[in-house]
Amino acid sequence: LAALASAPALAAGRAWQPAGFVALGDWGRRGDPVQSAVARGLAAGAREVASRFVIAAGDNFYPGGVASIRDPHWKDSFEAVYVDPGLQTPWYAALGNHDYRGAPQAQVAYTGHSRRWRMPGRYYKASGAVCGVPDLDLFVIDTSPLVDDLNLDERVQQLCRGHWWQAEAEPEIAWLRDALARSRAPWKIVVGHHPIYSGAHGDSPVLIARVAPLLEAFGVQAYIHGHDHDLQHIRRGSVDYICSGAGSQGGRVRAIPGTRFCLGQPGFAAFRLRPEVLQLQLRGAAGEVLYSAALPRTR
């Protein structure tokens, strides 16, 4: 934790160029009307913020993931839906619980067969040099092995496919701690499928105990997730928790302690990163801005 004594300085000697990106979760429904509508709004939002990449926050393929890299789901839910030129950028994807009902490794493998799909592992880091935003490090984690021992349905789904969450969780937590400790980026964002704090499915005690302290300790500014089929902005401590899980469906949501905004309708999140502020917009299916907030780099 000694590395946290002072925040890293912003890259010097160059003019800052505002960097945009967009995020959506819970989206892959073979191009159904709601998914397609949100895809059009996402494209408009991506153009407006000059998006450099897309965050896909899990549950990428409903209802049971993909079976292989040749599964028709890839075309029906991804390649043939997000066709706008503004979305032909890297997609940094996380795994969700529905993805584990198929072959999650196929989503990792698809990275080698796609010009834009990025999932080099179940959890990984995309540095600023990789994602095209020099002052940002992006950390994508796989939350299902961390939380699904508390959910009987998901536990059975995973056990039937040989996923032993206890064995998979410890190395991931150790990796996240080490990766955050090593990061010198002024901006750090962590992406996972499941919420840590939630006004829909409810808080995750495991993630509160094991992930939230790492976010606080290592100066992470934001945690972006899906799972809840809604749009939320919650601030707890020094971290902003942003739900963008409404890529193909809306759902019920309520305000909880720390809630700045919540709405249970389809949509997505758009961001514009500046040296000291991350501008957040939660947008509806048509791309309209429903809520905006300026998230400071230091709290």
Q: What do these predicted ranges mean?
A:
Residues 260-261, 266-299:
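A short C-terminal boundary segment appended to hydrolase-like catalytic domains
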